Amino acid sequence: DNFLKLKKNNLFIDIAKRLKAYQAENPDKKLIRMGIGDVTLPLAPVVVEAMKKAADEMGVKETFRGYEDSGSGYDFLKEAIAGYYKKFGVSLELDEIRVNDGAKSDCGNIVDIFGDDNIVLITDPAYPVYVDSNKMNGRTVIYADSDESNGFAAMPDPSVHADLIYLCSPNNPTGSAYTREQLKEWIAYAKANKAIIIFDAAYEAFITDPDVPHSIYEVDGAKECAIEMCSLSKTAGFTGMRCGYTVIPTALHVIASDGTDVSIAQI
């Protein structure tokens, strides 16, 4: 029944079909694609060479890699991710970082650890995966409008309760980004509601304004209420390769249905 609540057509597939039909009728027209956030350039040569080397290593007994022990990614990659966050003044432990096959997967899968009766707040417009993954689990989804009246930066309404909050900054699809002061307001709202923020930072590399955080963890208190997801799709052209990561701070705790205090990082 929950699957029947989804829209009949996938947004990106529908756009692709319309593009294909239009191009067939107008072969001389050059289109600027504003649909799915794909890349337009190939992988960097250094990435290609590293992948070739990694493939060669898999064919040698001494350098072959099988299952990774921690289940959350190789340390050499997590160390590189932690090093990247240090540029923003954010300190992460390796066991707070989970490497995945792209942010999209974790955006959908992360909700499995939360109760189906949770109320989910999503800024609108938003990446369709946020809505679909929660509707498939039967959750109530409410919206905070992002439009010209608020500079395309939806802010929390203290009179509205939510258990899960999806924020994307810079936003997909509007491109707007939250300032530190705006994120402070969302963090205060989340704590007041004992809610969890799922912060999508897939487009953080496009930020140039020094007042706009690359990570929600640049703001005090975020580690107690936020899970952050990021991707190499936009920073390294990995849309066809699938690699990203999720950060779950050890300081992030939730209350289970039986009243026990649970560390999400241990789930």
Which residues does each PLM region occupy?
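Local beta-strand N-terminus motif with an aromatic residue
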Residues: 31, 117, 162, 194, ...
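Hydrophobic/aromatic beta-strand patches that form the interior of the parallel beta-sheet core
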Residues: 32-34, 121, 142, 198, ...
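Conserved core of the PLP fold type I
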Residues: 61-190, 204-219, 227
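Walker B catalytic acidic pair
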Residues: 201
